Amino acid sequence: MSITAGPKVTTTAALVNTDRKMNNHHSTQVLHGSGQHGMQPSGNNVLNGLANGATGLQSSASSTSTRDDSTIVGLHYKIGKKIGEGSFGVLFEGVNMINNVPVAIKFEPRKTDAPQLKDEYRTYKILSGSEGIPQAYYFGQEGLHNILVIDLLGPSLEDLFDWCGRRFSIKTVVHVAIQMITLIEELHDHDLIYRDIKPDNFLIGRPNQPDANMVHLIDFGMAKLYRDPKTKQHIPYREKKSLSGTARYMSINTHLGREQSRRDDMEALGHVFFYFLRGQLPWQGLKAANNKLKYEKIGEKKRSTNVYDLSQGLPVQFGRYLEIVRNLGFEETPDYEGYRKLLLSVLDELGQKLDGEYDWMKLNGGRGWDLAINKKPNLHGYGHPTPPNEKSKRHRNKFNQVPLAVNNLNGSNVPLQSHSPLPGGTDLTQGVSNAPQQPQQIMSQQQYQQHTQQRLDPMSYEAYKQQVQQRYAQQPQPTQQKAQKSPNNDTSQQQFSQNRQQQPQYQFQQNQPQNGKVQVADSNSEKGFFSKLGCC
């Protein structure tokens, strides 16, 4: 049984029917929105055969855009402003040029140690048609990146929580909690566990849409199969597992290195509910010498915090929920409907109803949230960025005031002289030094105009692409001496460079479906014990 707050809405499938008929390239994008009442969300090898013929993955040759316009990907998705960034890569808003439907475009470097977009795309296709799950339209390669295009949504619950003074009313928490439980139930029904429950990954819809205040779930890069889709055989219980998720919300069993299952998603939801009700959790702000000790402290604090103390001054039903899910067995099926009824009883006791009214609808004199007023606090979600910090402001001002050096014919940078040099050749842009001065190069008017034209909007795709190209160009190349020290002394520097260039393609292809079955790597195989941990 699915319970949602507010009027029932249709899925996004109808909106993209025209697009899917006209485009053979499926892709996915992340969410984001602007306006009133809304803003901004891997399984393992058991996934064999689950998405046979359903994912529509294209090879790199067929999925790479052939358009001359550098701001168009996937043949007809035009890239707009940057709206988010994080460890995964960068997120841009965009538009489907065929039907003018807004989309989100997620960029992931192809050379990343743990690519996730391909597995995330598969998960979106598995969940396609589920209420509260954005539609995935396209996945492919564009230059140095993997690209995912999905529905554009509104702000995350974390953003709305900030805008509402970092405290939700009991009524709003019940509204969102019921929807969050239903979304996780839908994921579990498709044999997947989420493993990274946090407010940042739950978004509401875009303004002026039927689902403007409906909670959606995004970002399935950490999702994993907990049972075989065909036989329904549950994964075995194991210990000494690496931590996966966000330390602030993860379950106690996850801190203890135990294999995650459905119970861990439900416990993490309980921690989010108390976060919304209390404003913060008792294990926030703990200090330690390093991250490993910090996560251990968080786990110890969770174990030592009594649920009764956590529920002080709050409806007892929230504490009861946390007690129930913490006592679930490893393979036990959660009572999703029972949890919803338990939380609905809170409204009954308060004499309130599930009427679809949320705290964020009261912002700005009852007009609701507005990005022109309510700023996105950071770029790690899927909202609009805030102005740069003081350090970046200084960098920006310096960039705007001092002409950059122009590369000479030898490829080295030389300092530039002001356009109006002072008598005696004095240049105020240079520091005072007794060392012999290098020959200075005066920038011509034409060079200055070209330099000015290169000042791109830092939120634009062109600026991001320029940064990526510069970063790759600055990567050190292996010397001939290093190549001779390699195990194969016959390998030339040219062959070594070719192997490096071919490596990303191999990494992308190695998870391609084999023998008609989808092979998905277990994200626990990543190097590093804390490689999957989020903010705590």
From Swiss-Prot:
Residue ranges, compositional bias (Low complexity): 43-65, 437-453, 463-514
Origin superkingdom: Eukaryota
Gene3D superfamilies attached to this UniProt entry: Transferase(Phosphotransferase) domain 1
Q: Which UniProt keywords apply?
A: ATP-binding, Kinase, Lipoprotein, Nucleotide-binding, Palmitate, Serine/threonine-protein kinase, Transferase
* InterPro entries in alphabetical order: CK1_Ser-Thr_kinase, Kinase-like_dom_sf, Prot_kinase_dom, Protein_kinase_ATP_BS, Ser/Thr_kinase_AS
State which Enzyme Commission number(s) the record gives: 2.7.11.1
Q: Where is the active site?
A: 196
Top enzyme category: transferase
Query: Which residues belong to any copy of the Protein kinase domain?
Result: 77-361
- Lipid moiety-binding region for S-palmitoyl cysteine? 535-536
- What GO molecular functions are on record for this protein? ATP binding; protein serine kinase activity; protein serine/threonine kinase activity
Which residues fall in a compositionally biased region of kind Polar residues?
A: 26-42, 407-420, 427-436
* Region: Disordered, residue numbers: 26-68, 407-524
Briefly state the protein's biological role. Answer: Casein kinases are operationally defined by their preferential utilization of acidic proteins such as caseins as substrates.
PANTHER family on file: CASEIN KINASE-RELATED
**Protein name per Swiss-Prot or TrEMBL:** Casein kinase I homolog RAG8
- Name the gene for this chain: RAG8
